[in-house]
Amino acid sequence: MAKTSTSPVAPTRLWVKAAFTGFRRSKHTQNSNQALLKLQNVNTKEDVAFYQGKRVVYIYKGQKKNGSNYRTIWGRIGKAHGNNGVAVARFAHNLPPQAIGSVLRVMLYPNRA
């Protein structure tokens, strides 16, 4: 019996990494309900248009009495911020300041086709 060789295939992800760079702000005012996200492999504001309306999730570990569990904060990408592939996202609950610099997941659904 011949043995067939299968090449290892990387698992398919239904999300893209995004770095939480900070809150949208002006000189004196910080809008803590608007988060700035730098999307992976997105370098122009035209590329950000594909991600408008996509869901974003911040996953963190919350402490409880017996161990810990994962918790999430969901949001949605609204528009581009500047010309370099940064997007503005709004969340159901504001992201904590400790999340600045952490990686969020941008889900590739819903599809706006």
Curated annotation (Swiss-Prot):
Keywords, comma-separated and alphabetical: Ribonucleoprotein, Ribosomal protein, RNA-binding, tRNA-binding
Protein's GO biological process: translation
A family per Pfam: Ribosomal_L35Ae
Gene Ontology MF term list: structural constituent of ribosome; tRNA binding
An annotated GO cellular component: ribosome
Similarity comment: family membership: Belongs to the eukaryotic ribosomal protein eL33 family.
Protein name as catalogued: Large ribosomal subunit protein eL33
Species this protein is from: Tetrahymena thermophila (strain SB210)
